[in-house]
C-alpha cells in the first residue's frame, strides 16, 4: 500500500468561527493551532497547507488562569542596545490591539518556518463580536462545551 500524499487540488478548506468570550487563552490557542495545521483531518500532509480558516471574535474577553494576567511577561527587542521591552497581558488587553494576545499565543504554538507563516495567515482575530467573513458561511464551534476547563 502506498503512502497517501495530498495534492493541491484535493485541499478542501473549511471556515470556523469561535467566540472567545470567557475562554482560557492557552487552551484556545492550542485548539486553533491544530485547526490551522490541519492535524484534525485524516488527509493531513505535513508539507501542504491543508488546515482550515479560523475566525475568532470577542478576543478582548479572554481569560488567563492563575495570576498570569498580571505576572506573565511578554518580551520584545527593538534591535537597539538596551532595547528590551516588557509588557503584560493585562496591558495588551486594555490597550489598542487586544487581539494580539491570542495572535501571539497561536503563533507561538505553530512551528517555525515558511509553512507556519502561511498557515498563520488563515487566522482572523477580531476584538468585537462582528467579523467581515459572513460570505464564507463559517461553521460555529462551541469550544467551551468541549471541556469544562476551557471556560473560566
Swiss-Prot record:
CDD domains registered for this protein in UniProt: Ribosomal_L13 (cd00392)
This protein's GO CC annotations: cytosolic large ribosomal subunit
Pfam family, one: Ribosomal_L13
Family to which the UniProt record says this protein belongs: Belongs to the universal ribosomal protein uL13 family.
Binding partners and assembly: Part of the 50S ribosomal subunit.
Cross-referenced HAMAP family: Ribosomal_uL13
PANTHER family: LARGE RIBOSOMAL SUBUNIT PROTEIN UL13M (PTHR11545:SF2), RIBOSOMAL PROTEIN L13 (PTHR11545)
Protein name per UniProt: Large ribosomal subunit protein uL13
Organism per entry: Wolbachia sp. subsp. Drosophila simulans (strain wRi)
